[in-house]
Every structure is written in C-alpha cells, then in structure tokens.
Amino acid sequence: MDISEIRQKIDANREKLASFRGSLDLEGLEEEIAILENKMTEPDFWDDNIAAQKTSQELNELKQTYENFHQMTDLFDESEILLDFLAEDDSVQEELEEKLAELEKMMTSYEMTLLLSEPYDNNNAILEIHPGSGGTEAQDWGDMLLRMYTRFGNAKGFKVEVLDYQAGDEAGIKSVTLSFEGPHAYGLLKSEMGVHRLVRISPFDSAKRRHTSFTSVEVMPELDDTIEVEIREDDIKMDTFRSGGAGGQNVNKVSTGVRLTHIPTGIVVQSTVDRTQYGNRDRAMKMLQAKLYQLEQEKKAAEVDSLKGDKKEISWGSQIRSYVFTPYTMVKDHRTSYEVAQVDKVMDGDLDGFIDAYLKWRLN
C-alpha cells in the first residue's frame, strides 16, 4: 500500500467517523447511561426480574456503543500520528496498516450495530401481506411475496410461522400473516413495509398482455412483556369460525379460528394456525396489541411531522419497490435507488442488499 492509498483510507475513515458522530447524541448517550445506572441502584430494582434484566441488557448495550465509538476515535487519532511519522520513517508503515485494518473492522461492526439500534429492532416480527385490487393476478403476486419472505426467513435461521392464511379464489392469497422469530427479525424486516409493484406478462391472461399488480406489506414488532398495551374487554368483538390450512386443507369441524375486532379503531385481526380456539385467541391478541401500539406510534410521528412542517406520504401506503419481469428484469427500491437485475435471486429471498441499503439510508 503506497502513501496515497493510505491517505485515501484515512480520509474515508474520517468521513465515516463523522457520520457515526452525527448519528450519535453522545451527551444524550452519557445521560441515558447515568439514568440507567441510578435506576439499577434502587432497592426495589430486582423485584421485577424480567424488567430488571431488560434494563441491565440495555445499559450494557449503551455502554458498549459509547466505548466502541471512543476506541475507534483513539485508533483514528493514532493512525493520523503514524501517517505524520511515515513521511520521515517508513518503518512505521506496517504498524499503520495494522491500525487501519483494525479500525475498518471495528467500523464495519459498529455500523451494523447502529443500523439495528432503534427501539424494537431486536424483537420478533409480524408481517402481513395484502394484495391490492386486480383479482387473481394480484393474489398470485401476494403468494409470490409470501414465498420470498418465507425463504428469506429460513435463510436467516428465523422460525417462520403462518398465523393466518386466506386463500385466493383461483390462485394465490387474499391475505396472509406471518411471524418471524429470531435476533433482529423486526430490524431487518421493517424495510419491507409499503407497497410492492409487479410488472410482468400475466400467466392468467390468454392474450399474454403485460400487467401491473400491487401488494401492500405491513410489518410490526412483536411486543414483549415489558410493553403494556391496555385493551378493554368491552372494546373487543370476538367471532369464531372453522379454519383450515393453505388452500383449504385440514378444515376443522369445530370453530377454532378466531377473529377479533377492536371496536374503537375498527382494527381486525384473526388467527387460524392453532388447533384450539384458546391458542388462536392468544395469538390474535398479540397481533392486536402490536397493531394498536404501531397505530399510537404513527400518531406520535404524524404530530412531530406536523410541528416540523414536514409533508410526507404515509410510508406503508406508498410504493417502495418495483419488480419488473418484462421487457427487462430489474428490482428497484424507490427510497434508496438500490437496484439489481437478478429478479429470480430476489424472489428466492435474497433481500440483503435492499435491507442494507435501506438501513444505511435511514441512518444517514
């Protein structure tokens, strides 16, 4: 590595560190660490063991973030000092290159930590697929997305479970709800929230014309026991029905499927996967809690935007990505401009490039 390459690396590292500093409120981080440390000294801190463990984990993660940033800053300062010496003594080059390699390794790891550091990023995820108008073509597109997300989840080692499945009239799906259980499931899948557009020659059109279909995807974090969402029993209407598997297999002779309607908001959720009515009601309640929590967060975000004067489209109601099968092949994310030509790989669950681009776009 010649000196000009070393200078370029140091300049790039300087920019990346500045980006990290811009995304971190160091004073706020110090204050948050102090608050949690004081909280852990309270006499009744360990009375609620689950909450205490969560607080302890949160404190450790914040401390790690703070310490790692300062370690990277120290490494960068050392590399600049060694660069000054390099002009007079080339024997320091090996040490300088080792410092740069160590710094770049730390920055790569740190960047991923920052990308997945928002609230609930480490939670499990609930993902819903709702085809738009367009009949069989749109419902088949929904089924293609179901396959894509299932393959993505399996490749990541997540436990993927179908919570509710409504088959299409001729092919595909009318709607489906999935759960993804594993580290950072929500943090990775939140990039998929929005409307997905398909352009292809429809296999259901005898004239072989090109069709455009739309399907909306909604993603919510599964809430743990430390987050309480109060739901009054009087506000819930419960309906039961006979449920079956995908395509109508294993139709139950008893009404085990559960549909819950939250009367004040009109939100409807249902679960059919469990063999018992009790199990499906429990799953449906978790889905309802997640939806109500998300609704409250969206209201707060809308209030902040109105105070700022921002005019933004509702994220889950806007087109986020196009999948073009003809006259050329391309998948393009309209938020980040990230695109690939290998549409088959994407449909097989290779979403890492899109997720990485989205997380970096949010960070910046």
Curated annotation (Swiss-Prot):
Gene Ontology CC entries for this record: cytoplasm
Taxonomic superkingdom: Bacteria
N5-methylglutamine, modified sites: 249
Main location: cytoplasm
UniProt entry tagged with the keyword Transmembrane: no
Keywords: Cytoplasm, Methylation, Protein biosynthesis
Organism: Streptococcus gordonii (strain Challis / ATCC 35105 / BCRC 15272 / CH1 / DL1 / V288)
Gene Ontology molecular function: any one: translation release factor activity, codon specific
Alphabetized SUPFAM superfamilies for the sequence: Release factor
Free-text function comment from the UniProt entry: Peptide chain release factor 2 directs the termination of translation in response to the peptide chain termination codons UGA and UAA.
SMART domains, per the entry: PCRF (SM00937)
Subcellular localization, as worded in the UniProt entry: Cytoplasm
Post-translational changes noted in the entry: Methylated by PrmC. Methylation increases the termination efficiency of RF2.
Pfam families in UniProt: PCRF, RF-1
This protein's name: Peptide chain release factor 2
PANTHER family given in the database record: CLASS I PEPTIDE CHAIN RELEASE FACTOR, PEPTIDE CHAIN RELEASE FACTOR 2
Entries under InterPro entries matching the protein: PCRF, Pep_chain_release_fac_I, Pep_chain_release_fac_I_sf, PrfB
Membership in a protein family: Belongs to the prokaryotic/mitochondrial release factor family.
